[in-house]
Amino acid sequence: MRVRDELCRDLKLNESEFAFAGELIEVNEGHAAWRGAAERVLRPFALTLLVPQIHYLRVSQWVNGRHLGTKLVYLRVPERRVRSVPAQTHGGLRLWQILDIEPGTLQGFITGELAHRAEHRLVNDLAELEHHDRAVTLEGLMRDRNRHEKDDRHRVDDARWWVLGRSNERKIAALQCELAELQGVVTRLQTEIDQLVAQDRE
């Protein structure tokens, strides 16, 4: 977010032209149970800045000409693109089928990207996982042919780490809950400190 803000400020560009892919993708409420799995599969794409072709050269020059202090991945969005439509499938849902894409100029581009980035079959167990080249379990185990990945650095249902969608309500609620827990810990520790200080004075 900071890099986008600085980029648009320095180049005098409208921030509304530059979206992170994840801001334009939401998991359909009817499939909310799969939110964590979707976040795991799509996180790299979700954190990708979409750069319109018309601004691509200036943005590349700006990025190359400075130390960003962070990682930035950006995709050039062609002015005209042959739209890839995800193939219809039989025998179970694929990840792209449970996603809602924000209407607008980037909708076709996002749909095309999801055609190959979100073609994972949604499977309920390892037996099903073994039957599909690309699949993901509810617990977040991803399969891409022979490659398997499960990133459990954070719980699959931990909304603090979610990046899909424009609304931050779930993330804010999770962070507020964590803050309340930490404040409780601080209060308890302060009470213990006060008791120890009082004992020393006796």
Feature names for model-found ranges:
Residues 1-6, 181-202:
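Extended alpha-helical coiled-coil "stalk/arm" regions
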Residues 2-184:
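Hinge-like oligomerization/junction regions that interrupt long coiled-coil arms in large cytoskeletal
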